[in-house]
């Protein structure tokens, strides 16, 4: 195909028409002349039998469509009759390309049709004439009784298919009929309504020239916008599997104080059925939805006060609009000569004002892109697209993606390109710094980030002086506080709480890491347990270790107080109000300050104090309501089994008579036992991480882990060299070497050197709380399963009964 030819493709019938609907057909000698008052575009016409020839780049107002037309009958207002039996119709139909704001006369040349001078058009007969297969008509025109089909004219475009049979009495008015007896070929064309007056043509600066990379056709319809059909040999959509972007250029009337407004805005993909922009059609007529980008600039006077450029809100401010398909990234050499500037071919697109092209004689040969295809000249209609833009709904903002945004360079009326300011976050470009600052409000997550960060802590600020003052506060910290250092990363902290929180980060990172002791073979998956092991086994200063954080203490009472930090327990409650405290000293301070009234009367059973004797008597009745538990060794009665246990331990045993019912720990005095019981109230059970052992007292749990789950036995007996994990176990063992029975039961012959074993003997044998007794040793148990386990362990040779 030659460079100046367009290949025509069959499409659905569109129309070319006489927009004014007047009498525009007359006889001119041997020719019938049809006048079309509006601009006509012809596009998307491809067929093996129909091609477009003689496209003259120097004269863009002419496009020649050649077709084999056998018979054409045109009548103005009367029926054709008395014509020769057969009339030949010219093969050439001359239709000019789009010309704006002017009346265009098209001639349909019929050199082979013989019409006498004295015969009117109404006398022409059509008995042996052939009709075309397709008729394209529009607006105020009417087609009636063509062949055997009746056709109605709709709104702006009417499609009619004519059967190519001989005509007998058919009438065609105000229309051009193109016939072809070959396979169907549809001329796809549409008109552009021009509402501007002739005086509008004075301003040539409002024209833009859009360069097309490939041979293409432009189709404009009043309701659907401009369509660019690029049909190159290599479709970019097919090669890259991605359609090029679509750029919408909006030109606004500028506020006198806002001369620099302009920029680029991304728009989401358009829906195919609602899109008024540019559609790129491949040869298979498959619609690919491109991305859209809106580039805007300003000219002359208007008022643009909106901060955010919203598609719906700016509809009233649109001055001109043109919708452009994506061009190649190169710039034509002729465009560079017009601009008298060297423009980078990899960065710019060709947007040349048509006024400049006119100044150079409308030489389309000199205005070509890299592929050598001629450029199409378009006029920016002031009224085009206003209704479409107003109907568009506000688009949702797209999240910024990682692709590179293309830059559209717009040459304004003054002949200079716009200067853009890119957003460093999403890549969008703006003409003024003011618009860029307004756009930055769409990135609040970046605005929320503060500039200055403290290297010693997590403090951040936007003010340098605030950071300086904060750093000074670190300098005031004592050296002792700064000595708190993380063992893993070396970071310093001002207090132990911050260090503990920081270590939790390392704990999560090294969850599967095994920690080994440097001094023995002990290893554990938790750093806290390793720290506890080091302090308890290899250090004599802090033998009591917290199982949660690994902190060591000299005394067990300190460990108990510390554990309340992790559990949040407040075992000490005020007896006069709802105040609770984790420390008994704080409770005493509360009572002295809040309840300063003297309470000299005390209950003998629970040691509660009261302000008068009546309150004590009422309180004593509570203890005397039910005493069903009788002691076997005396006449003492208790209201519950716990009181009975305490009675047996305190009265009928000699060592630590006051024993805790939860952990079986004994005390010398009831007051000590009461303080100890308060620790268990409201306290959760602590689970050993290595076995199923559970206990409410964290101190006992720590002792359990040290004694059971450590491999080393640092405490050795000097006599038998037996090893023990704890020092108290060694002390118990040393009593066995003395040969002396320390604890003797008053009710039986049982004796032992182990105080805890003696307590268990008294409770299990000499109380009724253990109803299930062993048949061999009379030891009592709470449940039958415990008794059976005891028999299997200690009386295995006898077996179960």
UniProtKB/Swiss-Prot annotation:
One of its GO terms (cellular component) is chromatin. Its main location: nucleus. Pfam families: zf-C2H2, zf-H2C2_5, Zfx_Zfy_act. PROSITE patterns: ZINC_FINGER_C2H2_1, ZINC_FINGER_C2H2_2. The modification Phosphoserine is found at residue 270. SMART domains: ZnF_C2H2. One of its GO terms (biological process) is homeostasis of number of cells. Keywords: Activator, DNA-binding, Metal-binding, Nucleus, Phosphoprotein, Repeat, Transcription, Transcription regulation, Zinc, Zinc-finger. InterPro entries: Transcrp_activ_Zfx/Zfy-dom, Znf_C2H2_sf, Znf_C2H2_type. A zinc finger (C2H2-type) spans 421-443, 452-474, 484-506, 515-538, 544-566, 572-595, 601-623, 629-652, 658-680, 686-709, 715-737, 743-766, 772-795. It comes from the Eukaryota. One of its GO terms (molecular function) is DNA-binding transcription factor activity, RNA polymerase II-specific. It is found in: Nucleus. The binding of ZFY to DNA is mediated by the interaction of the GGCC core base pairs with zinc fingers 12 and 13. Probable transcriptional activator. Binds to the consensus sequence 5'-AGGCCY-3'. Belongs to the krueppel C2H2-type zinc-finger protein family. ZFX/ZFY subfamily. This is Zinc finger Y-chromosomal protein. The lineage of its organism: Eukaryota, Metazoa, Chordata, Craniata, Vertebrata. The gene is ZFY.
């Amino acid at each position: 195909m030659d460079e100046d030819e367009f290949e025509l493709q069959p499409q659905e019938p569109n129309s070319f028409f006489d927009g004014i609907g007047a009498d525009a057909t007359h006889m001119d000698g041997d020719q019938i002349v049809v006048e079309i008052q509006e601009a006509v575009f012809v596009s998307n016409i491809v067929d093996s039998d129909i091609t477009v020839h003689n496209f003259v780049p120097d004269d863009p107002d002419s496009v020649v469509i050649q077709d084999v037309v056998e018979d054409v009958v045109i009548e103005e207002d009367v029926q054709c009759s008395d014509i020769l039996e057969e009339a030949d119709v010219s093969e050439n139909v001359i239709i000019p390309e789009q010309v704006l704001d002017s009346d265009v006369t098209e001639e349909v040349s019929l050199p082979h049709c013989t019409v006498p001078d004295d015969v009117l058009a109404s006398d022409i007969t059509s008995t042996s004439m052939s009709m075309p297969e397709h008729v394209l008509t529009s607006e105020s025109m009417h087609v009636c009784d063509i062949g055997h089909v009746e056709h109605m004219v709709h709104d702006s475009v009417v499609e009619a298919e004519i059967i190519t049979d001989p005509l007998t009495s058919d009438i065609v008015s105000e229309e051009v009929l193109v016939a072809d007896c070959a396979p169907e070929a549809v001329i796809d064309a549409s008109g552009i309504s021009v509402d501007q007056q002739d005086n509008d043509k004075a301003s040539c600066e409002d024209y833009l020239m859009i360069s097309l990379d490939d041979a293409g056709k432009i189709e404009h319809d009043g309701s659907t916008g401009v369509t660019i059909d690029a049909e190159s040999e290599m479709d970019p959509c097919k090669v890259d599997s991605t359609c090029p972007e679509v750029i919408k250029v909006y030109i606004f009337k500028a506020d006198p104080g806002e001369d620099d407004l302009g920029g680029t805005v991304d728009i989401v993909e358009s829906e195919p059925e609602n899109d008024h922009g540019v559609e790129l059609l491949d040869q298979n007529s498959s619609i690919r939805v491109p991305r859209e980008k809106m580039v805007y600039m300003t000219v002359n006077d208007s008022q643009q006060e909106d901060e955010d450029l919203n598609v719906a809100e700016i509809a009233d401010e649109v001055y001109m609009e043109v919708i452009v398909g994506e061009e190649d990234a190169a710039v034509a050499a002729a465009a560079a000569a017009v601009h008298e500037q060297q423009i980078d071919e990899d960065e710019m697109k060709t947007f040349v004002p048509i006024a400049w092209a006119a100044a150079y004689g409308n030489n389309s040969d000199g205005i070509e892109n890299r592929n050598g295809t001629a450029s199409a000249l378009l006029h920016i209609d002031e009224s085009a697209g206003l209704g479409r833009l107003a109907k568009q709904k506000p688009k949702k903002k797209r999240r910024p993606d990682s692709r590179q945004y293309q830059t559209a360079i717009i040459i304004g009326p003054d002949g200079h390109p716009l200067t853009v300011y890119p957003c460093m976050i999403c890549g969008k470009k703006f003409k003024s710094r003011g618009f860029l600052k307004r756009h930055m409000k769409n990135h609040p997550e970046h605005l929320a980030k503060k500039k200055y960060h403290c290297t010693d802590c997590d403090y951040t600020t936007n003010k340098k002086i605030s950071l300086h003052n904060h750093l000074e506060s670190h300098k005031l910290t004592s050296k002792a506080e700064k000595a708190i250092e993380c063992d893993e990363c070396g970071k310093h902290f001002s207090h132990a709480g911050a260090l503990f929180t920081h270590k939790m980060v390392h704990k999560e990172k090294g969850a599967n890491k095994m920690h080994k002791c440097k001094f023995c073979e002990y290893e554990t998956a938790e750093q806290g347990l390793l720290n506890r092991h080091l302090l308890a086994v290899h250090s004599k200063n802090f033998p009591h270790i917290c199982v949660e954080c690994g902190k060591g203490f000299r005394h067990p009472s300190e460990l108990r107080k510390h554990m309340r930090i992790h559990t949040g327990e407040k075992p000490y409650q005020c007896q006069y109000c709802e105040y609770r405290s984790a420390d008994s000293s704080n409770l005493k301070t509360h009572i002295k300050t809040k309840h300063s009234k003297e309470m000299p009367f005390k209950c003998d059973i629970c040691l509660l104090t009261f302000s008068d004797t009546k309150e004590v008597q009422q309180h004593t009745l509570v203890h005397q309501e039910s005493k069903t538990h009788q002691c076997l060794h005396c006449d003492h009665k208790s209201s519950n089994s716990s009181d009975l246990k305490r009675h047996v331990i305190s009265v009928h045993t000699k060592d630590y008579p006051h024993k805790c019912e939860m952990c079986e720990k004994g005390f010398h005095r009831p007051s000590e036992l009461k303080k100890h019981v308060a620790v268990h109230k409201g306290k959760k059970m602590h689970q050993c991480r290595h076995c199923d052992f559970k206990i409410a007292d964290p101190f006992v749990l720590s002792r359990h882990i040290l004694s059971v789950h450590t491999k080393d036995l640092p405490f050795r007996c000097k006599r038998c060299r037996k090893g023990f994990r704890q020092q108290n176990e060694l002390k118990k063992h040393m009593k066995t070497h003395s040969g002396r029975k320390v604890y003797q039961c008053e009710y039986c012959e049982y004796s032992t050197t182990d105080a805890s074993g003696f307590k268990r003997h008294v409770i299990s044998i000499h109380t009724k709380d253990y109803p299930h007794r062993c048949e061999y040793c009379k030891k009592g148990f709470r449940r039958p399963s415990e008794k059976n386990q005891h028999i299997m362990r200690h009386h295995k040779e006898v077996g179960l009964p």
